[in-house]
Amino acid sequence: MRPRLTAVFALTLALASSGGAAAAAAPTAPSVKPPPTLTDSHPCAGQPGFTCSFLTVPLDHRGHGKGELKLQVATADNASAPKGTLVFLTGGPGQPGVPFATRIATQRLPELAKNYRFVVIDQRGTGEFGALNCPKLQAEVGSSDIEPPSKDAIAECANILGDKRNYFTSEQTTGDLDMFRQALGVHKWTLDGVSYGTFTAARYAAAHPGNTDKLVLDSVLPHTDPQNDDMLYLTGLRATARVLRDACKTAPACGFDPAQDLAWIARHRTDSVLVWDMLVSYEFLDPTYRNPNPAGLPAGSGDPVGAIHAARGGDPTRLDQMLKLLDSGGDPVTGYSSGLHIATICGDGQFPWGTSESPVAKRWPAVDRVLRKLPAKATWPFTTKTAVGNGFMTECLSWPRSQHSAEPPERLPAVPTLLVNGDRDLSTPLEWAKEELGYTPRGQLVVVKGASHSIQNRELGHQGRDAVIKFLNG
């Protein structure tokens, strides 16, 4: 179901007869809401060239829930940029947008900032002024999609959010974004999303095709899931074999099969979910997966390919050390809200049991039925236990019933769309980008060799960013 549009006209026409002539009463004046505006504008602290403001939005764009939210936004000062407005959407879900304004516009994509007015938003439930704070969940999993939280952490978060958990889906964020567009006074804008921001950008385009000029989808999560398996992360599990084998073939070649090593680990240890979480976290430090000395870790503590191989050979020391060093949890809530993450994922996702509106008691039996039919190759080199034990599944199995995000059309509108993905990405694997390309009538895919997640923000080279610049400036 689409978000409901608020009615703006209520016209009563009274007819009276007198002397054979019909006389109409004067119509009631239509009640029209004023357009959204940005308030409390001021220079963004530490971000020259950007003005920070607040956008007031309804708690519930469907009109059932009462209340309002104030979302922080940042807008570049070049309001008359020749190519219009570009809204940059961060991921998670759980990341704010405002802290990234200067880095993206002036350090990573200055060629675009000359021609576009960059704008960002702290999406509902995120950032300095609106982050949903669930302390136990924040401490246990932080920004991880994969590490499973405890039942106590999930229950605490559900109690903290209460009925408001219904109002933090991407459907609601899409409504916020269109109010932001209106407040800026632009008819069309370009949307550039990274990671979960690709999901949000695509969902916006599906709901507002006439207001979408171009789309950039960087590190892609498909906007639709007809197979109902994205939350099992089956594509990511299988992609691990391809990524590690590719890393091992890079000179100097390993001389062994890292996928077979990982398959052995997944079947002989009880922490395969945490091993998988470590690999996904590690890609942000070292997309080669083989550097023993990556920045951000103590010397000699990198190289998960070698650590997994050594563990299979009987020495788990390095692997155990990596699991400790890259253990998730503890991210500051203003930088990443685990509470927003759980509310959005559970409200947006399609699961083996259906959606967040399915009764909690019926969810595990549905998962069990799916797992009984799932072939080993669907999760290899991991196991079905790894799939069902991931954070998405663990969080949402016991999450209270809540409003499910309106489902979009399977095919996106025919707007120019660039998809860009690293072939070493495990968080949003290349296979997902190829799937989304099939839903995109005017899409083109650029694969960045040797790169992992978040091309525009983290790519070491320039191939991906050059493709984005050419696409948008062309």
Predicted features, each with a name:
Residues A14, F88-G94, R312-D320:
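Compositionally biased, low-hydrophobicity segments enriched in charged and small polar residues
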Residues R245-F351:
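Alpha/beta-hydrolase-fold enzymes
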Residues A29-M278, Y282, G349, W353-G474:
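Gly/Pro-rich cap/lid or specificity-loop segments adjacent to the active site
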Residues M1-P27, L55, L177:
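Secretory targeting and sorting signals
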Residues P3, F9-L13, V57, G67-L69, ...:
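Intrinsic-disorder/low-complexity peptide segments enriched for small residues
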Residues P3-F9, S18-G19, S150, G300, ...:
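Generic alpha-helix initiation/capping and coil-helix boundary signal
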